[in-house]
From Swiss-Prot:
PANTHER family: RRNA 2-O-METHYLTRANSFERASE FIBRILLARIN (PTHR10335), RRNA_TRNA 2'-O-METHYLTRANSFERASE FIBRILLARIN-LIKE PROTEIN 1 (PTHR10335:SF6). It comes from Homo sapiens. GO terms for molecular function: histone H2AQ104 methyltransferase activity; RNA 2'-O-methyltransferase activity; RNA binding; rRNA methyltransferase activity. This is RNA 2'-O-methyltransferase FBLL1. Belongs to the methyltransferase superfamily. Fibrillarin family. Residues 1-97 are annotated as: Disordered. The keyword Transferase applies. Keywords: Methylation, Methyltransferase, Nucleus, Ribonucleoprotein, RNA-binding, rRNA processing, S-adenosyl-L-methionine, Transferase. Residues 8-66 have a biased composition (Gly residues). InterPro entries: Fibrillarin, Fibrillarin_CS, SAM-dependent_MTases_sf.
Length: 334
């Protein structure tokens, strides 16, 4: 009885030394013998604080070994944790400088921040169209909101980042967009042309057309047209002459579709951009052969291609052809 009492009572003062105090940064120094250390070896040692959990149980005199070393190790770890938190605090203090720079294409911008991104000035601040990220930048004391433009979801954005020389879409332009789908790219065209421009968005799918109409409800410069782009005369009464045609219809006869709409709506000297998906036209031929064939078809319709650009790495076997529409002058009859 005497021996047991001595064992349990001898180490009672060691608890504050190595265990509990060490979690907060090693204040206890790790030198304590633990809850039950320091007796005559008659009783089992107690817990030595948080650090003791990884140690095994031993025989007589075990209280000292269990309580001593582990509390010290854990205390050291507490100091290391404090170091990490301090480093993070220093990083938070240095605020990141963000800015927006105009792109060489008028109405398009480059966001400089943690990650650079292509952006357009949001025509409807506070509203996203397809879940894109919005960023706010203060310029001259005025807050401006921009929408990031994902090149993996937009052929036009992919062409811009790919280095296309001209897109011919700028503020106040009138644009005919064939194959508008749910309005992802159309919404960015809406941002570019601004409130003084117009984009006529033609889409045949009624399911995508519903989304397009919802986008147009908040953007007054979008006019949705739910019709087949193969029959431009069906919507002739809705659309005036335009400056630019952008086509993303992904159909085997897309060159003919562009030509029909150009003859009906595109002004002389107007421009066109057509996104060509090689597999949709001829899956047996190489992409280069398909692109060359489509260019020849455009030339036969008085659509003069000026530039051709592939869309890798954003799209596979895709190309954008940019050109000008110049119909042959009418011969005077005598």
């Amino acid at each position: 009885m005497k021996s047991a009492a001595s064992s349990r009572g001898g180490g009672g003062g060691g608890r504050g030394g190595g265990g509990w105090g060490s979690w907060g940064g090693g204040r206890g120094g790790g030198g304590g013998a633990g809850k039950g250390g320091g007796g005559d070896g008659g009783g089992q040692g107690g817990k030595g604080g948080f650090g003791a959990r990884a140690r095994g149980f031993g025989g007589g005199g075990r209280g000292r070994g269990r309580g001593g070393g582990d509390g010290k190790d854990r205390g050291g770890g507490g100091q290391r944790r404090g170091g990490v938190a301090k480093s993070k605090s220093r990083r938070r203090k240095g605020a990141m400088v963000v800015s927006v720079e105009p792109h060489r294409h008028e109405g398009v911008f480059i966001y400089r921040g943690a990650e650079d991104a292509l952006v357009t000035l949001n025509m409807v601040p506070g509203q996203s169209v397809y879940g894109e990220r919005r960023v706010t930048v203060t310029e001259g004391g005025v807050k401006q909101e921009y929408r990031t433009w994902n090149p993996f979801r937009s052929k036009l954005a992919a062409a811009i980042l790919g280095g296309v020389d001209q897109i011919h879409i700028k503020p106040k332009s009138k644009v005919l967009y064939l194959g508008a789908a749910s309005g992802t790219t159309v919404s960015h065209v809406s941002d570019i042309i601004g409130p003084d421009g117009l984009v006529y968005a033609v889409e045949f799918s009624h399911r995508a057309g519903r989304d397009l109409v919802n986008v147009a409800k908040k953007r007054t410069n979008i006019i949705p047209v739910l019709e087949d782009a193969r029959h431009p005369l069906k919507y002739r009464m809705l659309i005036g002459m335009v400056d630019v045609i952008f086509a993303d219809v992904a159909q085997p006869d897309q060159s003919r579709i562009v030509a029909l709409n150009a003859h009906t709506f595109l002004r002389n000297g107007g421009h066109f951009l057509i996104s060509i998906k090689a597999n949709c036209i001829d899956s047996t031929a190489s992409a280069e052969a398909v692109f060359a064939s489509e260019v020849r078809k455009l030339q036969q319709e008085n659509l003069k291609p000026q530039e051709q650009l592939t869309l890798e790495p954003y799209e596979r076997d895709h190309a954008v052809v940019v050109g000008v529409y110049r119909p042959l002058p009418k011969s005077s009859s005598k």
